[in-house]
Amino acid sequence: MADFLGMMKQAAQLQSKMKAMQAELDQIEVEGLSGGGLVKVRMSAKMEVRGISIDPSLIKADEREVLEDLLVAAHGDAHRKAEAAMQEKMQALTGGLGLPPGLGLG
């Protein structure tokens, strides 16, 4: 019975820490780049796009397809960085709990 109560207490603590981590992830911002920095996407570690910056040289009718490709690439770069930031926070939170890797608690 004591083991069960201990596990319940640990689960409650983990839930509290997860809430705090979600707030921290919202504060972390990463920037994805493409085209040598001509296109930038800012994203929170919660995968929310915060902003997009496009170099004026790309805003031409004949550059539309290039711009679209660069936007996709910059978003992908930002997404990878946000995922890495989230994984780092998750590892810090769950590192001592012996949970299986990749367990999505977020």
From Swiss-Prot:
Q: Does this entry carry the keyword DNA-binding?
A: yes
Q: Where in the cell is it found?
A: Cytoplasm, Nucleoid
Q: Name one GO cellular component term.
A: cytosol
InterPro entries in the record: YbaB-like_sf, YbaB/EbfC
Q: What's an example of a GO molecular-function annotation for this chain?
A: DNA binding
Q: Which SUPFAM superfamilies match?
A: YbaB-like
Keywords from the named record: Cytoplasm, DNA-binding
**What does the record give as the function of this protein?**
Binds to DNA and alters its conformation. May be involved in regulation of gene expression, nucleoid organization and DNA protection.
> Quaternary structure?
Homodimer.
Q: Which family does it belong to?
A: Belongs to the YbaB/EbfC family.
The name of this protein is Nucleoid-associated protein Rpal_0620
Q: Which organism is it from?
A: Rhodopseudomonas palustris (strain TIE-1)
